[in-house]
Amino acid sequence: WRGILAEPARCWHQALHSNRSACIEDRCVWKSSDSTLTFNEVELPELSTVDAFSGVDKHAQFRERGKTYQVNTISLTDLLAKHGAPEQIDYLSIDTEGSEFEILQHLDFDKYAFRVITCEHNFTPMREKLHELLTGHGYVRRHEDLSKFDDWYVRPS
């Protein structure tokens, strides 16, 4: 596939740059660019997240002894522009362990549209906020029983 992969957790950087042909972004996707956030990298690295979101879901106990460090940020809109993404994008997967709403709330939906979005929710209260946001931009939730922790949204033609 062709695409952009954003991953601020340092433990993944070497392998991603060595093994993926996609564009790799080491900055943390966030609601704004050029900020600095504390990132919490944990023993189960797929549960690493922006430290402010370390306690928001049922995985909080795995994040209690993480290694924290500062990361620079880039907004999703700026990330797409930096890499010359088309205005119509086939697929967006957003799995940031808690900050999904913050990121999507600040996305320029007038500039970028997606045929399919999968968005992790982990059954937190953020799930309904994401639903309101995405349906407000014309997306429809589908396949609610397909994935346990992710919602699938499509944008009808």
Predicted regions and their residues:
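Phosphate/nucleotide-binding beta-alpha loop and adjacent structural elements of enzyme active sites
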Residues: 1-157
